[in-house]
């Protein structure tokens, strides 16, 4: 179970999965993702919104010890470029209300 949620969250942090998952959470997280510095901190609430109270403790721990996550989020700048189009694309079939915010 521990391994599963960790592995699951790993992919969640990857650009592609991140987009599809992020669109499900409040879109305001996207806007916050604009500042690269904040992204590191956004990672915590993002996990909270996505997972609610399922395994927040384990995730929080994972993210704190996963120093690489910070590095992994650096290329988010490239993701940011394809963020708006990708987001509106994903949201298109995900939820029209979110598209308005994106």
Swiss-Prot record:
Keyword entries, A-Z: Keratin, Repeat
One GO term describing the cellular component: keratin filament
Keyword Transcription carried by entry: no
GO molecular function per UniProt: structural molecule activity
Family as reported in the entry's similarity comment: Belongs to the PMG family.
Subunit note: Interacts with hair keratins.
Official protein name in the record: Keratin-associated protein 25-1
Protein's organism: Homo sapiens (Human)
